[in-house]
Amino acid sequence: PPERRKPREEGLRHCLQIGVEALKARKSPLDVVELVVRELENNEHFNAGIGSVLTNSGTVEMEASIMDGKSMKCGAVSGLSTVLNPISLARLVMEKTPHMYLAFQGAQDFAKQQGVETVDSSHFITAENVERLKLAIEANRVQIDYSQYNYTQPVQDDAEKELPVANGDSQIGTVGCVAVDSQGNLASATSTGGLVNKMVGRIGDTPLIGAGTYANELCAVSATGKGEAIIQATVARDVAALMEFKGLSLKEAADYVVHERTPKGTVGLIAVSAAGEIAMPFNTTGMFRACATEDGNSEIAIWPPA
């Protein structure tokens, strides 16, 4: 519906603008993807940060990951309930620890050590997400099973991932951003609140390097959709592997992974190559996505290309 679609489109337009401006100002792709995903985490219309959906206990457990293509350094976090911007904590894990992944209490303790901004967990609980949880509990479903009850198919987002929601609200998903600069340096970042009515402690594809997020010297990928399907197919890494080992173009690799390797209605992704090729395939009804190129061309869309 327009009242749900418009704020998301406006959010994508804003994020596209700040991302392009940052690249023009010679910010690194790593800086750019963190900046854009932070903006999405701060927008209650997306399922990350302030807009995160709720677990079956009515709590928030956020997760995120970030990866630099050239160095292949990466950082990931999950089980966060008080960190304002999970993507920035993921970057700190990458840059300030010998590890790649911190979760739950250990991640929140690390956030305090680093002086990361935290808030009371109630900050993340919105009326809209309380209602979503109520509907999911009444239907006795984790919000991923759209085979019954009035669930629409998942929609995904270039600046966000999408999962099904009751009453035609198909705008719950992960947010993600990929970027490449004029030197071909690449980066990817992904963040989410997960699934409506998920079990406490459930971890999806978003913080898993190679599943929801991946970047190397060939491409950067951020995936969205049903986390379990993305994990099983190692979606983000498979796109890069097909380019590396089979010599496929980015579009060929991304299309193959989405349309041949994953069940229909479960996956979408955004990807960019070192040469600046863009791919945004999805096998869901739609996917919120946006992209911009250095020549000034840009696109914001939901539905499949005509």
Swiss-Prot record:
Q: Which residues form the active site?
A: 174 (nucleophile)
A molecular function annotated in GO for this UniProt entry is: beta-aspartyl-peptidase activity
A Gene Ontology biological process term: proteolysis
What Gene3D superfamilies does UniProt report for this protein, alphabetically? (Glycosyl)asparaginase
Query: One Pfam family name from the record?
Result: Asparaginase_2
Superkingdom is: Eukaryota
Q: Does the keyword Protease apply?
A: yes
Where does tissue-level expression of this protein occur? Answer: Developing seeds.
Binding-site list for substrate? 202-205, 224-227
> What PTMs does it carry?
Cleaved into an alpha and beta chain by autocatalysis; this activates the enzyme. The N-terminal residue of the beta subunit is responsible for the nucleophile hydrolase activity.
Keywords in alphabetical order: Autocatalytic cleavage, Hydrolase, Protease
General function of this protein: Degrades proteins damaged by L-isoaspartyl residue formation (also known as beta-Asp residues). Also has L-asparaginase activity, which is used to liberate stored nitrogen during seed development.
Q: Which PANTHER family match?
A: L-ASPARAGINASE, N(4)-(BETA-N-ACETYLGLUCOSAMINYL)-L-ASPARAGINASE
Describe its assembly. Answer: Heterotetramer of two alpha and two beta chains arranged as a dimer of alpha/beta heterodimers.
Name of the molecule in the record: Isoaspartyl peptidase/L-asparaginase
- UniProt organism field: Lupinus arboreus
What is the organism lineage in this UniProt record? Eukaryota, Viridiplantae, Streptophyta, Embryophyta, Tracheophyta
